[in-house]
Amino acid sequence: MFEIKHRDAMGRIGKLKINGKIIETPTIMPVVHPNPKKQTVSIEKIEKLASVIITNSYIINTNPELKKIAEEKGIHNLIGFDKVIVTDSGSFQLSVYGEITVEPEEIIEFQEKIGVDVGTILDIPTAPYVQREQAEEELKETLRRAELSVKLRDEKNYKLLLNGTIQGSTYMDLRQESAKKMKELDFDIYPIGAVVPLMENYDYAQVIEIILNSKKELPTNKPVHLFGCGHPMMFALSVALGCDLFDSAAYALYAKDGRYLTESGTLHLEDLKDLEKFPCSCPVCIEYTPKELAKMEKRKRTELLAEHNLYITFEEINRIKQAIKDGNLWELVEERCRAHPKLLEAYRKALEYNEFIEEFDPITKKSAFFYGGYESLYRPEIIRHKKRLERIKSDNIYITTISNDINRPYSENTNMMDSDALVLIKDDLFGLVPLSIDTVYPLSQCDNPKLYCYEKIHNNEFVEEFKQNNKDKIMDITSYNYYINHYTSNANKNKVGSDAIRINNMIQYQYGFKLNDEELKKLIIKRSKKTNRIRNVLIPTDGNNKEVLFTLRSNDNLLIPAKEGAKLIHEKLPFPKYRVVIDSEVEEFARDGKSVFSKFVINCDKELRPYEEVIIVNENDELLAYGTTLLNGKELGEFNYGAAVSVRSGFK
């Protein structure tokens, strides 16, 4: 069972429950040799860092001594590890030696027999760039074996969870086909296989394409494991694209060659030995100097280097988790991807899929949008803004520029005249920023240095396209001034207050509907005495009473509905827009203000994004409650564990 606890980009901090044991993802699974005598770092030290390890069931099965212990005492006793143990099936040996002496069903039976927590099918790891015919044939065989493995597990009611490995070489349509078929077989975890040769050749862009094309077809409610990815420099980008699990033999293999891992690359101990201290504060690097480590006999040196490599690997995973919680994972990705040109190339390739990524990126975050380079202009936050700008409807649009010396939010630092015209500021980051909503995340919750000319012209095409699509509504400076004079004159009897117009534009931008003039004139706007920003929107009710419609949240200026606001959304938007439909079994819990759990969601607006404000209804579209969705539209339809909507309040 898997649930999302925090998220940013496509990355998620998840809680994965396996045989009563809890794993927090993303995490790394250190590769452990089943023979303790061949293990570089002791299992006792690994256990202090890892909640899950991965070892090789094929090696155990083909070694009589190890096999006997595993069959009699179980794999946890063999290795001396009480937490979750995942096993590979021999696919690695198949990729190295070309053949192995085990059958697909036999290795599944063996993994179950020795008490493995998560087993792996005997897939065929197709190498990159092979002939298409070979890739198709090997994928066909992998899928056949997958079907046999699932059938065996289900018929014999095996306890172990199963990995269904995605193959297809470097043919993206085959990766999608593999993911789609594996999804139909309902595996528990989905490793993406045969990417190690690509990473060894620094072909990170191909790895990224494989991840994203696999993710397009994989279920959102199951973890994804990037098989063989063990270098920390690759973790941030991979997590941002939805990978939850990694495995690392690199910590030990690199140590044997005298290589010292960092989060941004690999150093050689030989090149460090003249330094007084290591560039790290792990226990190994505090205890020893580079010169001391270099002079040690090889076995001890390898062990200590491997320990450092393991520490730095887990440190990067923990740093990524913190970035997800803080809402600045993209900033970490942009920092990491500048460690190597090929990694930057991979990031740029990922951003070619930004419309897909945007579906999973939260609409609001704790941290501001920080510009890290030209690639930032393609991030999901900017793509979403440009799409949602189309929601704001106006018959009168005026586009203007503003001095670079004026700080955001522009509306608080300029003296534009009030009117119902849609005033758009040309902006280097977002293309066009409506003056009336420029306090909304991320339009003012952002920062950037002065941009170069090539960066400034990035949005020219977008602006020109917008002008062309709205050419009948665009006003020049003369017509705009004339319009302003008329609008503000006493002769205009239909004038609506500027605050009400601002709220109307915010409603359109956030929810996609607008209020008419009569409804706008009834709005009561309350501003903060301290900041002078709008804080509450109220409407008159019976007698002299007033009810809160929306509250503007201070950190992102989004409209958070109160009960009357939820009623308004329900009234104005057709089913299923901004709705989460729940089972009648839990209607009363929702009415009582209890959180909605995923397994009770039966329908929803498929266009929802994480952290949107939604209304909760039954199948008859009766309004039950309102709150914040923790999942997007696709996830709401696929998750069956954990919270789906954090309910603010219900309707009795």
UniProtKB/Swiss-Prot annotation:
Reaction it catalyzes: guanosine(15) in tRNA + 7-cyano-7-deazaguanine = 7-cyano-7-carbaguanosine(15) in tRNA + guanine
Residues that, per the record, bind substrate: D123, A194
Start and end residues of each PUA domain: 577-652
Pfam families for the chain: PUA (PF01472), TGT (PF01702), TGT_C2 (PF14810)
EC main group: transferase
A single GO BP: tRNA wobble guanine modification
Binding site for Zn(2+): C280, C282, C285
Residues at the catalytic site: D88
Cofactor binding annotation: Binds 1 zinc ion per subunit.
Key words of the record: Glycosyltransferase, Metal-binding, Transferase, tRNA processing, Zinc
Highest taxon listed in the record's lineage: Archaea
EC number: 2.4.2.48
GO molecular function, a single term: pentosyltransferase activity
Cofactor: Zn(2+)
Protein name: tRNA-guanine(15) transglycosylase
Source organism of this protein record: Methanococcus aeolicus (strain ATCC BAA-1280 / DSM 17508 / OCM 812 / Nankai-3)
Source species taxonomy: Archaea, Methanobacteriati, Methanobacteriota, Methanomada group, Methanococci
